[in-house]
C-alpha cells in the first residue's frame, strides 16, 4: 500500500501532498506524489493514490450503498470525464483465493461495448450506458502471457480511453485485509506485493 510506504517514510515536504476524509463508515487518504525524488524514496510512481479503509466492508453491511458511493466518488477523481470506452482488466489467479479478486470482479462487470443505443433503449435504459469491456487475464503460469502483454494487445485493438486494472493488494497490517481499497492513476505492478517483479 502506498499509504503504508508513506507512513514508514514519514515523508513530508514539497514532494508529497496528503488529504484525509472521514465519515461514519470509512477513512479515505489521498496521497499525491509530486516529483521523481519522492517517488524514488517511496518506491512508487509519481501520481495520485487513494486509499479507502472500510472496517465493515461486507456485502451484508447496512452502509453498502454509502460505501459504493464513496468508491464511485474516488474513482471519479481518477477517470477521464468523457464517455469513451473503459476496459476493466481483472488480473490474478482465480485458482488461488488470495489472488482471485481481479478475476472475480471482472466476472461481475456489466460489459456494454457490444450493446447498441437502440438495444439499450428497448431493454429499458433511458440514458445510454458508457461502453465497457471486461477481461480476466489469468497469470503467466496459466496462460504463458504476462498480464501486461495481454492487456496491451487488447488496448491496441479496441483503443479504450482508460483501463481499470483490478488486482489483490498486499498489506503489512492484517487489519487492512479485506477492508482496504487502493486506487491510483499510475498503473500497477502485478506480483510486486510478493516481490515478484519481472
Give the location of each predicted region.
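A structural signal for small-residue-enriched, beta-sheet-centric alpha/beta enzyme cores
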Residues: 135-136, 149, 165-198
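An N-terminal, well-structured beta->alpha segment
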Residues: 37-81
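Gly/Ser/Thr-rich loops at beta-strand to alpha-helix junctions
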Residues: 91-101, 141, 168-172
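Short glycine-rich or small-residue beta-strand-to-loop segments that form or flank ligand, phosphate
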Residues: 51-55, 85-96, 134-138
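A structural-propensity feature for long, helix-poor, extended segments
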Residues: 124-155
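Glycine-rich phosphate/diphosphate-binding loop of Rossmann-like nucleotide-binding domains
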Residues: 93-130, 134
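Proline-aspartate-enriched helix->loop->beta-strand connector
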Residues: 155, 160-161
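N-terminal amphipathic/basic leader segments beginning at the initiator methionine
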Residues: 1-46
Amino acid at each position: 500500500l502506498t499509504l503504508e510506504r508513506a507512513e514508514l517514510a514519514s515523508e513530508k515536504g514539497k514532494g508529497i501532498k496528503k488529504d484525509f476524509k472521514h465519515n461514519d463508515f470509512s477513512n479515505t487518504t489521498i496521497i499525491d506524489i509530486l516529483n521523481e525524488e519522492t517517488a524514488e524514496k517511496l518506491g512508487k510512481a509519481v501520481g495520485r493514490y487513494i486509499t479507502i479503509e472500510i472496517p465493515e466492508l461486507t456485502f451484508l453491511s447496512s452502509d453498502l450503498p454509502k460505501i459504493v458511493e464513496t468508491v464511485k466518488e474516488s474513482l471519479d477523481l481518477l477517470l477521464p470525464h468523457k464517455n469513451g470506452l473503459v476496459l476493466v482488466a481483472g488480473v490474478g489467479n482465480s485458482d488461488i483465493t488470495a489472488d482471485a479478486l481481479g478475476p472475480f470482479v471482472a466476472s461481475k462487470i456489466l460489459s456494454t461495448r457490444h450493446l447498441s443505443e437502440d438495444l439499450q433503449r428497448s431493454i429499458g435504459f433511458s440514458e445510454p450506458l458508457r461502453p465497457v469491456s471486461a477481461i480476466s487475464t489469468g497469470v503467466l503460469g496459466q496462460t504463458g502471457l504476462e498480464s501486461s502483454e495481454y492487456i496491451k494487445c487488447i488496448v491496441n485493438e479496441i483503443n479504450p480511453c482508460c483501463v481499470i486494472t483490478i488486482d489483490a493488494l498486499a498489506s503489512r497490517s492484517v487489519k487492512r485485509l479485506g477492508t482496504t481499497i487502493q486506487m491510483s492513476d499510475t498503473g500497477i505492478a502485478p506480483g510486486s506485493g510478493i516481490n515478484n517483479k519481472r
